[in-house]
């Protein structure tokens, strides 16, 4: 399978209605980047913009819309939907939207499709941050260029502009 590029992905997203489920660590910078590129972005979250704090204020000022409240998933719509890492593709609402023609993806999925270099992933219940940090440092010490990201605090998709 041929790798996509970030530029190709952004070109394909132009003119689409983009929905991001949740305003978590990975979606904040993605929403900001997409808004900066002039895309129509809506965040769907259970929490109100006030509860979401400064990130919501900044994104609102950039033209990002918010749909919030207990029924946010029932209101969910879009041409391209970025699911939160904790929401599986087989969620009933996502299945409905896919059946209606929506593309459902995630920040991590797009990163995996576009990343031009080897990827090391760490999963599990306990110790992921420590293990990931140790692996990254060992690779750095051996002379490798390392791009550390994920739930460690940096959205991986945004790092694609620095990876070759």
PLM segments and residue spans:
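Phosphate-binding loop of NTP-binding sites
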Residues: 74-76, 85-164
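N-terminal leader/targeting and accessory segments in enzymes
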Residues: 1-106, 110
